Amino acid sequence: MQLRGTTIVAVRTEAGVAVAGDGQVTLGQAIAVKHTARKVRRMYKDKVVIGFAGATADAFTLFERFEAKLEEFGGNLVRASVELAKDWRKDKYLRRLEAMMIVADAGNVLILSGTGDVIEPDDGVAAIGSGGPYAMAAARALLRNTELSAREIVEKSMAIAAEMCVYTNDQLVVETLEKPA
């Protein structure tokens, strides 16, 4: 699946989680039609952050289904993700959706892939979309070699991705969740 026009990155630290996404929407392969789209959003009583990449209508379909699963399972991020993935694999309509999501709460970061997989990165760093490899490399380097906050890491990682990827811009939406004391 070729995901163009978006980069989403998430970083988990001891203090919490930050998720960032750029605002560019690209039509086809060359025309940027919007620069301030919100691809990172809060849900479930502001305790979960989701970022999505891929076809917009498909992403919103998954967003709505994921929100329903969170409600059904009392905000349990992992359970809601696994149950959505099961539906994603079983449902012929859902299997054709071209979207990916990063979902996070204060202690977890998960990637929900376009094939219905649930992936928890070992180091708490995840990235999807066209600039994902650049953002992930930058985030890992910053996490390992600096004392920056999760928010600062995702902001700097997205800036680097925007320099490298023509389908990513510097109009960021960043959401953070702190671990309870």
From Swiss-Prot:
Protein's UniProt keywords contain Metal-binding: yes
Regulation: Allosterically activated by HslU binding.
Intrachain S-S bonds: none
GO biological process entries: proteolysis involved in protein catabolic process
Alphabetical list of CDD domains matching this protein: protease_HslV (cd01913)
Keyword Cell inner membrane: no
UniProt keyword list: Allosteric enzyme, Cytoplasm, Hydrolase, Metal-binding, Protease, Sodium, Threonine protease
Binding site for Na(+): 162, 165, 168
One CC-aspect GO term: proteasome core complex
Subcellular location(s) per record: Cytoplasm
Subunit organization: A double ring-shaped homohexamer of HslV is capped on each side by a ring-shaped HslU homohexamer. The assembly of the HslU/HslV complex is dependent on binding of ATP.
Name the record gives this protein: ATP-dependent protease subunit HslV
Gene name in the database record: hslV
